[in-house]
């Protein structure tokens, strides 16, 4: 979920990213390649619409996602960030979706939005495929005055860094930034972009961990170490080994 003044009335509104329709009283039974009980693939469950609660200024909220054009059909959302990505002074909404196209809702004024992720180059990876997007962070990592995006993904599919091209769109800068191979074997969830060492450049933190015990099938450990990256002005360098013992441990 994320807060932002989406209609420009001075009151914070709430956007809630929803995932799938799952009833624990009537669960879907899924298995891995060996027939053992396992986690279901997102395609096996129906999506739940996202919600946007507009602050009425009197302590109450009204759900207006459809009225504001802030709902992408068929999305299975796990992350959201509200920020001004096109530099017009109005907050936009980026939504990370699992195995479907990510969404970027551009604020067109008066509380109305236009979904523009495909047109602006941040709906899919640079290779053109939709990823298992989960965590999302925004920050100006290259200090050009425009907010960039970092999205975490499933194991065997690297996280993605989208560089903002001055408000006209985004480009996949993952490989150029040396972030492809370090993130490829891990499964990322939460992430933040912030200047953690006060050197003036944004850093990246990623919390990793598998969704299932795949060690018995693929050999992948479902406990995974977190990652910390620093930016040197050109590329990203993993620096967890020097940041303390926390980054040498594995978590779920």
PLM regions and their residue ranges:
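Acidic, glycine/proline-rich Ca2+-coordinating loop motifs
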Residues: 1-252
